[in-house]
């Protein structure tokens, strides 16, 4: 996916964190390609937020895809990340002690997706995810993030 689309979807995600409830702790710069050098933090999730009321931190990795496609198994789905990236997100979660969530936008535009899915990293062990599986994590488009039983919703 191209760089500009990714940034537009990250901006969409940031707008869902209402300032009265959420503090933005970090936004990944993703500048490795620009400086032609590896930057360790570029492999971290895109956004780190803290809930102001509960003082709980969450990391969010944003992935936009234009559509689902038919996979080798004959089911509609998408590849949300490469395996090595999933390992990096798992390591980040383990080392930092707070959960990583994956926000996937599908269809429409990166700034206004048709559908959105919010999935705990622990529920996405593989790079391929079927549409059927993702449906249980579907959230309303443009609905602000909230905390529910200490989970990001």
Where are these regions (language model features)?
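Non-catalytic C-terminal interaction segments of nucleic acid-processing enzymes
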Residues: 1, 8, 16-25, 29, ...
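Short, surface-exposed loop/turn motifs that are enriched in glycine and acidic residues
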Residues: 3, 37, 75-79
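Conserved alpha-helical elements of sugar-nucleotide-dependent glycosyltransferases
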Residues: 5-13, 85
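Short amphipathic alpha-helical segments and helix-helix/interface helices
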Residues: 14, 86-93
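Conserved catalytic cores of phosphodiester-cleaving nucleases, focusing on short active-site segments
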Residues: 17, 45-71
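Active-site metal-binding core of divalent-cation-utilizing nuclease and nuclease-like domains
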Residues: 26-57
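Surface-exposed, flexible loop/turn segments at secondary-structure boundaries
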Residues: 32, 55, 67, 108-110
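Mg2+/Mn2+-dependent nuclease catalytic core
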Residues: 65-89
